[in-house]
Swiss-Prot record:
GO terms for cellular component: ribonucleoprotein complex; ribosome. This is Large ribosomal subunit protein bL20. The lineage of its organism: Bacteria, Bacillati, Actinomycetota, Actinomycetes, Mycobacteriales. PANTHER family: 39S RIBOSOMAL PROTEIN L20 (PTHR10986). GO terms for molecular function: rRNA binding; structural constituent of ribosome. InterPro entries: Ribosomal_bL20, RIBOSOMAL_L20_CS, Ribosomal_protein_bL20_C. Pfam families: Ribosomal_L20. Belongs to the bacterial ribosomal protein bL20 family. One of its GO terms (biological process) is translation. Binds directly to 23S ribosomal RNA and is necessary for the in vitro assembly process of the 50S ribosomal subunit. It is not involved in the protein synthesizing functions of that subunit. The gene is rplT. NCBIfam families: rplT_bact (TIGR01032). The keyword Ribonucleoprotein applies. It comes from Corynebacterium kroppenstedtii (strain DSM 44385 / JCM 11950 / CIP 105744 / CCUG 35717).
């Protein structure tokens, strides 16, 4: 069999790794072995955090909705329950956006939710 010389491919591979490791601190941006290891960890964090971001944003939306709901004398869970009973189908992202940008519309939704809720807290839903 013919001898395989891979200097061109190996250099290209190393150059790509070092290029993608730019901005890392210390040896992690200059030494191939350290840079490669850091790239593997970076990809792991990248994958994990793309999924975690969805939950983080949901928590942020719920916090914003709860704060705005309390300004309208409601709690978050009563607001969501009232909106569901009133037949208002709006997701938390848009509800949080309304709470921040359009307080009058959010107050109208709170009023609709209050009307749909039963008077007695422990009473079953309509």
């Amino acid at each position: 069999m013919a001898r395989v010389k891979r200097s061109v491919n190996a250099k290209k591979k190393r150059r790509e790794v070092l290029k993608s490791a730019k901005g890392y601190r210390g040896q992690r941006s200059r030494l191939y072995r350290k840079a490669k290891e850091q790239m593997l960890h970076s990809k792991t964090y990248e994958f994990r955090d793309r999924r975690a971001k969805k939950g983080d944003f949901r928590k942020l939306w719920i916090t914003r909705i709860n704060a705005a709901a309390r300004q309208n004398d409601m709690t978050y869970n009563r607001l969501i329950q009232g909106l569901r009973l009133a037949g208002v189908d709006i997701d938390r992202k848009n509800l949080a956006d309304l709470a921040v940008s359009d307080e009058q519309a959010f107050s109208a939704l709170c009023a609709a939710a209050k009307d749909a809720l039963p008077e007695d807290v422990n009473a079953p839903a309509k």
